[in-house]
Amino acid sequence: MKEQKIRVKLKAFDIELIDQSAQSIVASVKKTGARVSGPIPLPTSIRKVTVIRSPHVNIKSREQFEMRIYKRLIDIFDVTPQTTESLKKLALPAGVDVQLK
Protein backbone atom coordinates (compact mmCIF):
# COMPACT_ATOMS: atom_id res chain seq x y z
CA MET A 1 0.00 0.00 0.00
CA LYS A 2 1.31 3.41 -0.97
CA GLU A 3 2.07 5.86 1.83
CA GLN A 4 -0.35 8.77 1.97
CA LYS A 5 1.18 12.20 1.73
CA ILE A 6 -0.19 15.74 1.79
CA ARG A 7 1.84 18.56 0.26
CA VAL A 8 1.03 22.06 1.53
CA LYS A 9 2.27 25.08 -0.43
CA LEU A 10 2.08 28.50 1.19
CA LYS A 11 2.46 31.87 -0.58
CA ALA A 12 2.41 35.34 0.97
CA PHE A 13 3.76 38.87 0.58
CA ASP A 14 4.71 39.14 4.28
CA ILE A 15 7.51 36.86 5.51
CA GLU A 16 6.44 37.00 9.18
CA LEU A 17 2.89 36.02 8.26
CA ILE A 18 3.98 33.01 6.21
CA ASP A 19 6.36 31.79 8.93
CA GLN A 20 3.65 32.04 11.61
CA SER A 21 1.23 30.13 9.37
CA ALA A 22 3.80 27.42 8.66
CA GLN A 23 4.56 26.99 12.37
CA SER A 24 0.86 26.70 13.23
CA ILE A 25 0.34 24.06 10.51
CA VAL A 26 3.35 22.05 11.73
CA ALA A 27 2.23 22.26 15.37
CA SER A 28 -1.35 21.15 14.64
CA VAL A 29 -0.20 18.26 12.44
CA LYS A 30 2.36 17.02 14.98
CA LYS A 31 -0.40 16.86 17.63
CA THR A 32 -2.22 14.28 15.49
CA GLY A 33 0.84 12.02 15.28
CA ALA A 34 1.74 12.55 11.62
CA ARG A 35 5.31 13.10 10.44
CA VAL A 36 6.16 16.52 9.05
CA SER A 37 8.94 17.60 6.69
CA GLY A 38 9.41 21.33 6.54
CA PRO A 39 8.69 24.17 6.32
CA ILE A 40 11.07 24.24 3.35
CA PRO A 41 11.72 27.76 2.01
CA LEU A 42 11.27 27.95 -1.77
CA PRO A 43 12.83 30.68 -3.93
CA THR A 44 11.34 34.13 -3.48
CA SER A 45 9.74 35.62 -6.59
CA ILE A 46 10.57 39.28 -7.12
CA ARG A 47 8.49 41.31 -9.56
CA LYS A 48 9.90 44.74 -10.40
CA VAL A 49 7.95 47.58 -11.99
CA THR A 50 9.58 50.74 -13.33
CA VAL A 51 7.47 53.88 -13.68
CA ILE A 52 8.22 57.40 -14.85
CA ARG A 53 8.14 59.85 -11.93
CA SER A 54 6.84 62.90 -13.75
CA PRO A 55 4.24 62.98 -16.52
CA HIS A 56 5.85 65.68 -18.71
CA VAL A 57 9.40 66.75 -17.97
CA ASN A 58 12.39 64.74 -16.72
CA ILE A 59 11.63 61.65 -18.74
CA LYS A 60 14.84 60.05 -17.50
CA SER A 61 13.70 60.24 -13.89
CA ARG A 62 12.26 56.84 -13.04
CA GLU A 63 11.22 54.99 -9.91
CA GLN A 64 11.31 51.25 -9.28
CA PHE A 65 8.93 49.24 -7.13
CA GLU A 66 9.19 45.58 -6.27
CA MET A 67 6.81 42.96 -4.97
CA ARG A 68 8.25 39.93 -3.19
CA ILE A 69 6.31 36.67 -3.03
CA TYR A 70 7.57 34.31 -0.32
CA LYS A 71 6.86 30.57 -0.57
CA ARG A 72 7.07 27.63 1.82
CA LEU A 73 6.55 23.89 1.31
CA ILE A 74 5.40 21.44 3.98
CA ASP A 75 5.14 17.67 3.41
CA ILE A 76 2.95 15.63 5.76
CA PHE A 77 3.40 11.84 5.96
CA ASP A 78 1.39 9.09 7.74
CA VAL A 79 -1.84 11.03 7.31
CA THR A 80 -4.75 10.09 9.58
CA PRO A 81 -8.36 11.34 9.52
CA GLN A 82 -7.53 13.49 12.56
CA THR A 83 -4.77 15.16 10.54
CA THR A 84 -7.12 16.18 7.73
CA GLU A 85 -9.70 17.43 10.24
CA SER A 86 -7.10 19.55 12.04
CA LEU A 87 -6.02 21.06 8.70
CA LYS A 88 -9.63 21.86 7.80
CA LYS A 89 -10.31 23.56 11.14
CA LEU A 90 -7.08 25.57 11.12
CA ALA A 91 -7.67 29.33 10.85
CA LEU A 92 -4.89 31.02 8.88
CA PRO A 93 -4.47 34.77 8.25
CA ALA A 94 -6.06 36.33 5.17
CA GLY A 95 -2.74 37.23 3.52
CA VAL A 96 -1.62 33.61 3.09
CA ASP A 97 -2.50 31.50 0.04
CA VAL A 98 -2.69 27.76 0.82
CA GLN A 99 -2.63 24.95 -1.75
CA LEU A 100 -3.12 21.31 -0.72
CA LYS A 101 -2.17 18.35 -2.90
UniProtKB/Swiss-Prot annotation:
Q: Which branch of life, at top level? A: Bacteria
User: Sorted alphabetically, which InterPro entries does this protein's record hold?
Assistant: Ribosomal_uS10 (IPR001848), Ribosomal_uS10_CS (IPR018268), Ribosomal_uS10_dom (IPR027486), Ribosomal_uS10_dom_sf (IPR036838)
Q: Does the keyword Hydrolase apply?
A: no
Q: Which GO terms describe its molecular function?
A: structural constituent of ribosome; tRNA binding
Pfam families with a match to the protein in the record: Ribosomal_S10
Q: Which UniProt keywords apply?
A: Ribonucleoprotein, Ribosomal protein
Give the GO terms filed under biological process for this record. Answer: translation
A GO CC annotation given for this chain = ribonucleoprotein complex
Question: Record's family?
Answer: Belongs to the universal ribosomal protein uS10 family.
**Which NCBIfam families does the entry link to?**
PRK00596.1, rpsJ_bact
Quote the function comment for this protein.
Involved in the binding of tRNA to the ribosomes.
PANTHER family for the chain: 30S RIBOSOMAL PROTEIN S10 FAMILY MEMBER (PTHR11700)
What does the record note on quaternary structure?
Part of the 30S ribosomal subunit.
UniProt protein name: Small ribosomal subunit protein uS10
Gene of origin? rpsJ
